[in-house]
């Protein structure tokens, strides 16, 4: 059942990333778990800061980040689906993570959660 749920999520989430531009998108998926004692709201707040920085550096409001949280099951595990309009925007986001602001945001993510898996997908609406 767990594998089926993960498969369904990985099939559906890239479509969510296309909701804004209705064509193609680059979607980066992260599989994460909260560290002990950390509340999801802290991750959400840090992710909002990451998204604002990323949109500014990518020069696009078409960058989006989705947090997929558990409805039934282990509430400490979740997924990020970060959608970019193209590889150029994704590369700009990665470069921004090396800035002082980006390093601080990444350090906060490291304090809040552990991410065990990461994939980059190219998606196209059919």
Give each language-model segment a name:
Residues 25-29, 75-79:
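Intrinsic-disorder/low-complexity, polar/charged segments enriched in Ser/Thr/Lys/Arg/Asp/Glu/Gln
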Residues 32, 81-82:
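Solvent-exposed beta-strand motifs enriched in subsets of small alpha/beta binding domains
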Residues 1-4:
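Positively charged n-region of N-terminal signal peptides that target proteins for export
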Residues 18-25:
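Cleaved targeting-peptide boundary
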Residues 26-57:
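N-terminal targeting signals for Sec/Tat export/insertion, comprising classic cleavable signal peptides
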Residues 22, 46-65, 74, 83-120, ...:
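An amphipathic, aromatic/His-enriched active-site/gating alpha helix that lines ligand/cofactor pockets
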Residues 9-18:
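Hydrophobic h-region of N-terminal signal peptides that target proteins for export
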């Amino acid at each position: 059942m767990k594998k089926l749920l993960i498969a369904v999520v990985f099939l559906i989430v890239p479509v969510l990333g296309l909701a804004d531009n209705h064509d193609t998108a680059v979607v980066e998926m992260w599989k994460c778990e909260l560290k002990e004692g950390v509340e999801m709201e802290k991750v959400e707040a840090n992710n909002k800061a990451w998204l604002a920085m990323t949109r500014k550096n990518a020069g696009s409001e078409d960058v989006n980040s989705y947090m997929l949280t558990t409805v039934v099951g282990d509430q400490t595990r979740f997924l990020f689906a970060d959608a970019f309009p193209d590889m150029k925007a994704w590369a700009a986001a990665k470069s921004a993570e090396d800035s002082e602001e980006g390093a601080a945001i990444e350090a906060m993510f490291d304090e809040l959660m552990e991410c065990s898996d990461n994939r980059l997908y190219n998606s196209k609406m059919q």
